[in-house]
């Protein structure tokens, strides 16, 4: 089913943007894992609407409720149910759009598939659905951190045509979160914020690129052919709202190189299980399996589809109309998408870790 993700570390999200609540059921989490609930809440706060002048003005505290699966902060190995209640819904903002197919939204395709759709807030297509992913991903991050000291760092690399260059060796979470746009390059971040504000005042929006770095990745994650690690990462990240592109390692720029330039040569080592490579054009994955190097990815997000300008479209009768959106929306989704990217990467790695252990650790 389309609301379920993962094979062993398995999540099922539920809820709509303007419904009573949104949440997740996480199944397959190993027992006896100590969970810091404050860290889950912190990830939700990073995703929360209304956190700055360049995000949607919708006001939600996004307070986490854990209904099952933990005892005194320790996982039981049973399903972990988590939810966040919606408190600032305004479905009346969408009354005039009930039968309108908004440009580049899911209204038209949902109607074509189901013959019915949630009229307000985008329903399941809303980024509010990602609350469940972020909550479950925060647990996955703690599992990976506990076992391998794995660290997942995502940041805004580009907004519109304003790009940044970041020293990944000095990258920290505190640097990423040092400004409201979540770009660790302070000078570039200032320009990004200004660009978003300008477009916001014009009733317009913009997109950009989020980059993700994963450090201390255990080798051996992923499988050949259909369950390659990069394939599952691509699927996970492209399932996020507004995503339009994914690349790993050298990505599309690697097509400009020769094989002699692109190949990642292994370095001599006394421990064959701790191999290193001279370069990392592969982005930490070869043959669909992690090699222990950093995993490096980029994800492209389109401009927010809801804008304050008049646009021509059609209604459910196929008649052309002119519409102007109301409601509360982000002029740029990227600052709030950073924890979403972190979470989807964590969910994939946690699932592949358990799959690897199940297949390859039973016989010594």
From Swiss-Prot:
GO BP field: amino acid biosynthetic process; aromatic amino acid family biosynthetic process; chorismate biosynthetic process
Cofactor entry: FMNH2
GO cellular component, one term: cytosol
Binding site for NADP(+): 47
Reaction it catalyzes: 5-O-(1-carboxyvinyl)-3-phosphoshikimate = chorismate + phosphate
Keyword annotations from UniProtKB, A to Z: Amino-acid biosynthesis, Aromatic amino acid biosynthesis, FAD, Flavoprotein, FMN, Lyase, NADP
Residues given in the record as FMN binding sites: 124-126, 287, 302-306, 328
Pathway(s) per entry: Metabolic intermediate biosynthesis; chorismate biosynthesis; chorismate from D-erythrose 4-phosphate and phosphoenolpyruvate: step 7/7
Protein name: Chorismate synthase
Protein source organism: Prochlorococcus marinus (strain MIT 9515)
Gene this chain is encoded by: aroC
């Amino acid at each position: 089913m389309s609301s379920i993700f993962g094979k062993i570390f398995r999540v099922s999200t539920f809820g709509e943007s303007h419904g009573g609540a949104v949440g997740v059921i996480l199944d397959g989490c190993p027992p006896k894992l100590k969970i810091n609930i404050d860290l889950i809440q912190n990830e939700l706060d990073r995703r929360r609407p209304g956190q700055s002048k360049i995000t949607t003005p919708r006001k939600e505290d996004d307070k986490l409720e854990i209904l099952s699966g933990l005892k005194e902060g320790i996982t039981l190995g049973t399903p972990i149910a988590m939810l966040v209640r919606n408190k600032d819904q305004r479905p009346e903002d969408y009354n005039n759009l009930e039968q309108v197919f908004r440009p580049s939204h899911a209204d038209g395709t949902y109607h074509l598939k189901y013959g019915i759709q949630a009229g307000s807030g985008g329903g399941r297509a809303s980024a509010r659905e990602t609350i469940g992913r972020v909550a479950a991903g925060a647990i996955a991050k703690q599992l990976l951190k506990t076992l391998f000291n794995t660290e997942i760092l995502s940041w805004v690399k580009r907004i519109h045509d304003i790009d940044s260059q970041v020293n990944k060796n000095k990258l920290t979470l505190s640097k990423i979160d040092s400004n409201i746009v979540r770009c660790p390059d302070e000078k570039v971040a200032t320009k990004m914020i200004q660009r978003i504000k300008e477009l916001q005042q014009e009733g317009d929006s913009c997109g950009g690129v989020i980059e993700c770095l994963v450090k201390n990745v255990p080798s051996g994650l992923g499988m050949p052919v259909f369950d390659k690690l990069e394939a599952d990462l691509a699927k996970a990240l492209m399932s996020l709202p507004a995503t339009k592109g994914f690349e790993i390692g050298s990505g599309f720029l690697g097509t400009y190189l020769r094989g002699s330039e692109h190949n990642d040569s292994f370095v001599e080592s006394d421990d064959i299980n701790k191999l290193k490579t001279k370069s990392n054009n592969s982005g930490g994955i070869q043959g669909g399996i992690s090699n222990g190097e950093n995993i490096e990815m980029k994800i492209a997000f389109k401009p927010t589809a809801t804008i304050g300008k008049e646009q021509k479209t059609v209604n459910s009768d196929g008649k052309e109309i002119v519409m102007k959106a109301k409601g509360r929306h982000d002029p740029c989704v990227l600052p709030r998408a950073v924890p979403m990217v972190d979470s989807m990467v964590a969910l994939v790695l946690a699932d592949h870790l358990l799959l690897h252990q199940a297949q390859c650790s039973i016989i010594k």
